[in-house]
């Protein structure tokens, strides 16, 4: 399961989550992550954090924030962070699928190599692959790797879709070019 962080597991902020003390877990997020684990999912956090490239803070800060995240929601198999800004045009910042591909390679040794944004949604590497996020950029990254897509309300987070996932729902529709 590819999972965005802010707005999915914890409340986001227009000024970034700048410290572990600012990380407020959305009620029910821990139980939702545990439900995914009980279903056999491996959890890969994929989060854009441009505050790093903006010089607001460094790697040590993101590690301390993610340490608190793991204390609060449980074991996370992979924590991927894109430090870049939109203008940096990297391959890891969502909606590009770089973080998801890298996490997939770490977890199962395979990833999607190319994305045809104008073509059909690719087949997932694993039929249970899913992306949970609160923004269209999350949905775009998930679409690019063929994952089932679950878009959440940022104030409710993962708890708003966990029952759909448990019920093996097909997920939300998304077209990356509309």
Where are these regions (language model features)?
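Conserved protein kinase catalytic core
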Residues: 10-12, 54, 139-140
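Active-site loop/turn elements of alpha/beta-hydrolase fold enzymes
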Residues: 5, 12-14, 48-49, 84, ...
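A short alpha-helix capping/helix-coil boundary motif
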Residues: 10-13, 46-48, 116-119
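Active-site neighborhood of HAD-like aspartate-dependent phosphohydrolases
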Residues: 1-44
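Active-site flanking residues adjacent to catalytic metal/cofactor-binding acidic residues
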Residues: 3-5, 47, 132-134
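Flexible, glycine- and charge-enriched loops at secondary-structure boundaries
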Residues: 19-26, 55-62, 93
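Asp-based, Mg2+/Mn2+-dependent phosphohydrolase catalytic module
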Residues: 60-63, 67-73, 77, 87-178
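Substrate-recognition element of Asp-dependent hydrolases with the DxDx(T/V) motif
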Residues: 29, 33-62, 66, 75-88
């Amino acid at each position: 399961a590819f999972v965005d962080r802010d707005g999915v597991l914890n409340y986001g902020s227009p000024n970034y989550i700048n410290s572990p003390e600012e990380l407020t877990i959305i009620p029910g997020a821990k139980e939702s992550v545990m439900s995914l684990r009980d279903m056999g999912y491996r959890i890969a956090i994929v989060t854009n954090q441009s505050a790093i490239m903006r010089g607001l803070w460094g790697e040590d800060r993101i590690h301390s924030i993610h340490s608190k995240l793991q204390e609060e929601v449980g074991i996370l198999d992979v924590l991927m962070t894109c430090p870049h800004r939109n203008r940096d045009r990297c391959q890891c910042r969502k909606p590009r699928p770089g973080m998801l591909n890298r996490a997939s390679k770490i977890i199962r040794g395979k990833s999607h190599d190319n994305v045809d944004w104008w073509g059909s949604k690719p087949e997932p590497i694993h039929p249970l692959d899913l992306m949970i996020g609160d923004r269209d950029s999350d949905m775009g990254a998930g679409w690019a790797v063929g994952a089932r897509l679950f878009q959440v309300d940022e104030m409710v987070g993962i708890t708003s879709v966990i029952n759909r996932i448990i019920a093996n729902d097909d997920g939300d529709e998304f077209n990356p070019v509309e």
